[in-house]
Amino acid sequence: MADRPRLPNNSSQTGKVFSRSSYPEYRRILSILRTETVGGALLLAATVVALIWANSPAADGYFALRDVKIGYEPWHLELSLGHWASDGLLAVFFFLAGLELKREFVAGELRKPARAVVPVAAAVGGVVVPALIYVLFNLGTAGETLKGWAIPTATDIAFALAVLAVINTHLPAALRTFLLTLAVVDDLIAIGIIAFFYSTGLQPLMLLAALVPLALFTFLVQKRIRSWYLLLPLALATWGFVHASGIHATVAGVLLGFAVPVLARGKKGEPAEGLAEHLEHKLRPFSAGFAVPVFAFFSAGVALGGLDGMGAALRDPVALGIVAALVVGKAVGVFGTTFLVTKTTRASLDSSIAWIDLFGLALLAGIGFTVSLLIGELSFGAGSAHNDHAKVAILAGSLISALLAAVVLRARNRRYRQVQADEERDDDGDGVPDVFARS
């Protein structure tokens, strides 16, 4: 049988979008995706446990645990466990998001405008179209429901990767890079939405006070100091002041992440990895394996009330808008924007992928969970009827999107295996797959 033709490496060709990155970047992306895949499985398990417990005869125990308050009241930090999970643990998740955002803009796929324009446009389309669809479903209702317009705008990369693991698909490097880049830009937009639209009772003095520990943290990390006993207290102080300022505390995580340098200086004695990579390796397992699953456990539990209760929840315009926005809006926004930008510019697809592959990823982008649940709580308040209906809709819309994406991507798995074989071939034995060695 004749050898399959090798696929060219288009990463350096101008006008190519969704092309392979460099081999070191490819390996870094694989490492991130592996960790997030495990995290996605734990996230799914935590969600299932929360739903079962919240709908069992012992449901009162679940809600009592979620509402247990701990902390120091004089500092306004006596919060329920549910709030500690959303305000505290998710700050670690957003710290890593800040690190990843800075890396992408400084040394990753987003540093070159020609390569950044399509994933950035796709992410924007994946936010704008779902938001518009949600608003259309809620125009004729009381103004309160319109506050949830941002709920279906986020994509959960961990859940999406868990779905890919379940269907055992072998995404080409170009698609993996696009998926991660899309998620990074999506996180940036979500951070902006939370900071500008869901901050209440702004306290300028507290915000100014937060700048002091943030500045000290920035000074230390710029000097490549990585001592946890210096950095951790400053990070906690920054978080505490931002929390007291009225801006959602997770924004502190992003600001701290932005402060960390992503490039190693390469001086004598400098570790092989930069400080950002060091912190990422230390914190990503904690974030994916503990912080996000615990948040999901406390946030996903909702008393469904059987089939009748689910039916009533899904008849709420809030729920209808979320489901339609996740399933239809995300796919149309991501795929449609990508198609339009590509066709109206000199860009073209990498030879390893086709438009049907991008449509499958666009469907996968409709899996919104972690940030969607957070925005739902910020929009309607934890425990409110609209928030409970939003939770049901997020679960339903994400499930439908996952099933549709699985059908499309699974059908392409044979092609993906062929591409993967080419991407792993190393005929010259230099330790770098041949497809990455070509310029």
Swiss-Prot record:
Region (Disordered): 419-439
HAMAP family, sorted: NhaA
GO (cellular component) term, any one: plasma membrane
Encoding gene per record: nhaA
Family label: Belongs to the NhaA Na(+)/H(+) (TC 2.A.33) antiporter family.
Principal localisation: membrane
Transmembrane segments: 38-58, 79-99, 117-137, 148-168, 178-198, 201-221, 228-242, 244-264, 286-306, 321-341, 355-375, 389-409
Protein name: Na(+)/H(+) antiporter NhaA
Compositional bias ranges of the Acidic residues kind: 421-431
Keywords in alphabetical order: Antiport, Cell membrane, Ion transport, Membrane, Sodium, Sodium transport, Transmembrane, Transmembrane helix, Transport
Molecular function terms, GO-annotated: sodium:proton antiporter activity
Catalytic activity, as annotated: Na(+)(in) + 2 H(+)(out) = Na(+)(out) + 2 H(+)(in)
Record membrane topology: Multi-pass membrane protein
General function of this protein: Na(+)/H(+) antiporter that extrudes sodium in exchange for external protons.
Gene3D superfamilies in UniProt: Na+/H+ antiporter like domain
Domain of life: Bacteria
Subcellular localization: Cell membrane
GO process annotations (BP): regulation of pH
